[in-house]
Curated annotation (Swiss-Prot):
Keywords (A to Z) from UniProt: Cell projection, Cilium biogenesis/degradation, Cytoplasm, Cytoskeleton
Segments traversing the membrane: none
Cellular component terms (Gene Ontology): cilium; cytoplasm; cytoskeleton; intraciliary transport particle A
Provenance organism: Danio rerio (Zebrafish)
Family under the similarity heading: Belongs to the IFT43 family.
Functional summary from the UniProt entry: As a component of IFT complex A (IFT-A), a complex required for retrograde ciliary transport and entry into cilia of G protein-coupled receptors (GPCRs), it is involved in ciliogenesis. Involved in retrograde ciliary transport along microtubules from the ciliary tip to the base.
Subunit architecture: Component of the IFT complex A (IFT-A) complex.
Segments for region (Disordered): 1-105, 187-208
One GO BP: intraciliary retrograde transport
Protein name: Intraflagellar transport protein 43 homolog
Bias-annotated ranges (Basic and acidic residues): 78-88
Compartments in which it is found: Cytoplasm, Cytoskeleton; Cell projection, Cilium
Principal location listed in the UniProt entry: cytoplasm
Amino acid sequence: MDDNLQLADGGFTKNVARSGRRARQSAEMMSAEDSRQRRSSSSISTAAEGPPPKPTRRQGGWAEESSTTTNVRSGRRAAAEEPEDRRLRPQTPEGSDNESGEDIPVIPDLEEVQEEDLTMQIAAPPSVQVNRVMTYRDLDNDLMKFSAFQTLDGEIDLKLLTKVLAPEQEVREEDVGWDWDHLEVSSELQSEWDEGDREDQSPLPVCV
């Protein structure tokens, strides 16, 4: 029949074109079948090509993270220990020969060290200069012998004072021993004398 469709090279072709309502219905049916055929052909082609490649899995977890963190920490520790190791290493001055034995300290033997006997040593007393204080006797002798002391600051004449100065024998008083009885009697006498002085100083009555 003329209405049959022929498949050629994966497509549909019409032998005869019709007009009218039946022709429109047949055209719609042909377009629907054409779309179905295309879908089926596309699915067949994709199946022939093979399944798409699977996405690569991301391998990781706590084990990998711990390994990376340990590597980072070990690197930091090594970087921090480097300057400390440099400080602890013995540093030799530049230009010195390490092979020579001059840099090696020599420890003396105990026999060579002389033991000092501190028991027989006596410390020297400190030498302190003390200014001697002049006594009254020295001052009196100076006043009597030297006329330079008869003036004060070169302006005040002290001759009148030196003339009336009494000798030491006349001024000195003998030491008298006191006990509690003497002290009580002296305090009573002193109180009586004070009362008598007050009575004498009291004003006399005025007669009107």
